[in-house]
From Swiss-Prot:
GO CC terms: ribonucleoprotein complex; ribosome
Main function: One of two assembly initiator proteins, it binds directly to the 5'-end of the 23S rRNA, where it nucleates assembly of the 50S subunit.
GO biological process, one term: translation
Subunit-structure text: Part of the 50S ribosomal subunit.
InterPro entries, per the entry: KOW, Rib_uL2_dom2, Ribosomal_uL24, Ribosomal_uL24_CS, Ribosomal_uL24_KOW, Translation_prot_SH3-like_sf
Name of this chain's protein: Large ribosomal subunit protein uL24
Amino acid sequence: MIKLKVKKGDEVIVITGKHKGKKGKILKVFPEDSKVIVAGVNLVKKHTKPNQMSEGGIRTKELPIHISNIAHIDPKTGRPTKVVFKFLEDGSKVRVAKKSGEIIGKEGK
């Protein structure tokens, strides 16, 4: 299992595949599979039969995407960027956009 640099709520862009260029927020992270679910990306329609618990019908849901197919969006430029970890003067570890040096995530807001 590799160290993931993505967290729930991060803004990402799809860089390869049939959804290339789409942007969205990460809804869920699966570290054991190295996959994430991105809002509005990789949508599929699921046909369900009615049962006692729920109605039947066609439901749309997002499927996971491998983390190698996404990149963080630089908060300063709005373009795809790589992420590095840096330590601040107070000793806290933060994620930083490699191109602009901006802090990514909740730490930067």
